[in-house]
Swiss-Prot record:
Record keywords, A-Z: ATP-binding, Fatty acid metabolism, Ligase, Lipid metabolism, Nucleotide-binding
Protein name in the entry: 4-hydroxyphenylalkanoate adenylyltransferase
Catalytic reaction equation(s): 17-(4-hydroxyphenyl)heptadecanoate + holo-[(phenol)carboxyphthiodiolenone synthase] + ATP = 17-(4-hydroxyphenyl)heptadecanoyl-[(phenol)carboxyphthiodiolenone synthase] + AMP + diphosphate; 19-(4-hydroxyphenyl)nonadecanoate + holo-[(phenol)carboxyphthiodiolenone synthase] + ATP = 19-(4-hydroxyphenyl)nonadecanoyl-[(phenol)carboxyphthiodiolenone synthase] + AMP + diphosphate; dodecanoate + ATP + H(+) = dodecanoyl-AMP + diphosphate
Encoding gene per record: fadD29
Associated pathway: Lipid metabolism; fatty acid biosynthesis
One record GO biological process: Actinobacterium-type cell wall biogenesis
Record InterPro entries: AMP-bd_C (IPR025110), AMP-bd_C_sf (IPR045851), AMP-dep_synth/lig_dom (IPR000873), ANL_N_sf (IPR042099), FAAL/FAAC (IPR040097)
Family: Belongs to the ATP-dependent AMP-binding enzyme family.
Protein EC: 6.2.1.51
Changes seen on gene knockout: Disruption of the gene abolishes the production of phenolic glycolipid (PGL). Mutant can still produce phthiocerol dimycocerosate (DIM A) and phthiodiolone dimycocerosate (DIM B).
GO molecular function, one term: ligase activity
PANTHER family given in the database record: DISCO-INTERACTING PROTEIN 2, DISCO-INTERACTING PROTEIN 2 DIP2 -RELATED
Length: 619
């Protein structure tokens, strides 16, 4: 069903960069050469290889909990994926030209995978995006479409009417035609006609990964086939060490339009020629126990979730849910996207230890879309490690252990970076910081993207940074400026926050994540710490999501008063800060990105415009 509504270069062979052997005295963290080799030059070639070598092997199993609450399994083989992707590719070339973008706005499911693979087979540039919610306009989708200006939008019959309303937003220039909207499931995917995979070009660019950011200034990271394949090689090497391949059977509920969801759910299974078990994010949110159950029942060995996913699994998975199930085969559960909470990891490992989940399976990881997805994690076979740092020292940019018994910021280690070259840099002077001094994390490697789509100025500032007087063995550039603050402490990487999100209260710097972690020890739910202006300076405000628990209004009022007192006391004691306002709201009130990170600037706007519905108004 259809309704009317350049990047181009030769394919590149992906190889792991061989980094210099020179060491930086303060922080010798050069990436090492991978043990893995990958001769294919594009993701399309890798799909063709999987279909050729393992045509009848299950490629993707999607568990549909909407059709059946017990889970209805849909399966496609590698031959079917390749065949259907080729049919989609031929359809695309009816309307597309070389270098065109093709947006994917479809529900989580096999059709999304076929659509994405079809764009790659056609040699066009994929733009994976979320499906819009019915009746709710999503400005982020509109902005990404306007920025990428696709000639075609791929979707499914069930949502084509809603998706078609977004097509006019995809016109980057005045007078440009709206893109064609194609429902993938309405194509004759079972056609037996002859198909020629060699007719399509193999450009260097694979897809645009839109990052969580401003709705008015979307950032589409241009990722090449080389970037993606390189990062897969790095990821496999760092997560599983000397093994020849990534653990089989990944389980994922992460959305396909998210960088880790795309990598773990779609790309890694293809590169490894194994079977992925998938479900939708909504299926997980409705019943978090499904995640652990799928890991056990499919004997999966690798999965991933942001911090809130671990919290939900702990709170909403019962012993009855896990009866007779075993997690002893799980080797890797990646946690990242948002700041990793040490207490959350401890609760998670304790909760599932009775079902043989090893604490060494939990892998705190650092990455970002600008580096494809992955940058660093600690080595395999090691339980998560954390260090409690002195708050006051961190506020002045120094990492020192908190004295015994004193309050501090408990930060998780991301190990010594091996896949990429990492430096900690003073963002003002652009000179390397010594170990123990907080600075901006700069990254270098073949996994670093080509830049931001149609934004040369921001590309130059972010992807082309150069060091001033680099240390021996360190190149001048180009470097990726991540915008993340971190420190090398005892040879390992720790993340302290974001440059743009530092709270300046009473003239001192404070990391909002530290304050949020203190509050979460009391409340357990989502929280955001923000600084809002008053007449003379900025004041600290905390917004806390709470479930209603009081049986009567009076009980609820007393509970809210107690929480407010405990939060104010804990912040004063741990951070030597006075909280100007403790706002308590219902779950789901705090704005978040597609990956679950709190949107601090949006929270400030809502607070200043009195848009939060406060539970504590009654207290």
């Amino acid at each position: 069903m259809k309704t009317n509504s350049s990047f181009h270069a030769a394919g590149e062979v992906a190889t792991q960069p061989a980094w210099g052997t020179g060491e930086q005295a303060a922080q010798p963290l050069n990436g090492s050469t991978s043990r893995f080799a990958m001769s294919e030059s594009s993701l399309a070639d890798l799909l063709q290889k999987a279909a050729s070598q393992y045509p009848n092997r299950a490629a993707y199993k999607f568990i549909d909990y909407d059709t059946d609450p017990a889970g209805f399994t849909e399966t496609v083989t590698w031959w079917q994926v390749h065949r259907r992707a080729m049919i989609v590719a031929e359809e695309l070339w009816i309307y597309a030209s070389s270098g065109d973008r093709v947006a994917i706005l479809a529900p989580q499911g096999l059709e999304y995978i076929i659509a994405f693979m079809g764009v790659l087979q056609a040699g066009l540039i994929a733009v994976p995006l979320p499906v819009p919610q019915f009746g709710i306009h999503d400005e982020r989708i509109s902005s990404a479409l306007r920025d990428s200006a696709p000639s075609i939008i791929l979707t499914t019959s069930s949502v084509i009417d809603e998706v078609t309303t977004y097509a006019p937003h995809a016109c980057a220039a005045q007078g440009q035609s709206a893109p064609i909207v194609v429902a993938v499931d309405a194509l004759d995917l079972s056609s037996s006609r002859a198909l020629d995979p060699t007719r399509f070009e193999r450009p260097s660019t694979a897809y645009l990964q839109y990052t969580s950011g401003s709705t008015r200034a979307p950032a589409g990271v241009v990722l090449s086939h080389k970037n993606v394949i390189t990062n897969c090689v790095q990821l496999m090497s760092d997560y599983i060490g000397d093994s020849e391949k990534v653990p089989s059977t990944p389980v994922s509920w992460l959305p396909f339009y998210h960088d880790m969801g795309l990598m773990l759910g779609i790309i890694l299974p293809m590169i490894n020629q194994d079977t992925a078990v998938l479900m939708s994010p909504m299926a997980f949110l409705q019943r978090p126990a499904r995640w652990m159950q799928l890991l056990a029942k499919h004997r999966a060995q690798i999965s991933s979730a942001p911090n809130f996913g671990f919290e939900l699994a702990v709170r909403r998975t019962s012993d009855d849910d896990m009866a007779g199930l075993d997690l002893g085969h799980v080797r890797t559960i990646v946690t990242g996207a948002e700041r990793v909470n040490v207490a959350t990891l401890r609760r998670f490992t304790e909760r599932f230890a009775p079902f043989n989940l090893s604490e060494t399976a939990i892998r705190p990881s650092y990455g970002l879309a600008e580096a494809t997805v992955y940058v660093a994690t600690a080595g395999p076979g090691r339980a998560p490690k954390s260090v409690c740092f002195d708050y006051q020292q961190l506020s002045v940019g120094q990492a020192k252990r908190a004295e015994n018994g004193s309050e501090g910021a408990n930060l998780v280690s991301y190990g010594a970076p091996r896949a990429s070259t990492v430096r900690i840099v003073d963002p003002e002077t652009r000179m390397e910081n010594p170990a123990g001094t907080v600075g901006e994390i700069w990254v270098q490697g073949d996994n670093v993207g080509l830049g931001y789509w149609r934004n040369p100025q921001q590309t130059e500032a972010t992807f082309r940074a150069r060091l001033v007087t680099p240390s021996p063995g360190t190149s001048e550039g180009p470097w990726l400026r991540t915008g993340d603050l971190g420190v090398i402490f005892e040879g390992e990487l720790f993340i302290t926050g974001r440059i743009k999100e530092l709270l300046v209260v009473d003239g001192a710097n404070h990391y909002p994540e530290d304050i949020e972690a203190t509050i979460q020890e009391i409340t357990g739910g989502r929280v955001v710490a923000i600084a809002v202006p008053d007449d003379r300076t900025e004041k600290l405000v905390t917004i806390i999501e709470l479930m209603k628990r009081g049986r009567t209004d009076e009980e609820e009022k007393n509970r809210l008063r107690t929480v407010k007192r405990e939060v104010a006391s804990a912040i004063s004691r741990s951070h030597r800060l006075r909280v100007a306002d403790v706002v308590m709201v219902a779950p789901g009130s705090i704005p978040v990105t597609t990956s679950g990170k709190v949107r601090r600037s949006a929270s400030v706007e809502r607070y200043l415009h009195h848009e939060f519905s406060r539970l504590d108004a009654m207290a």
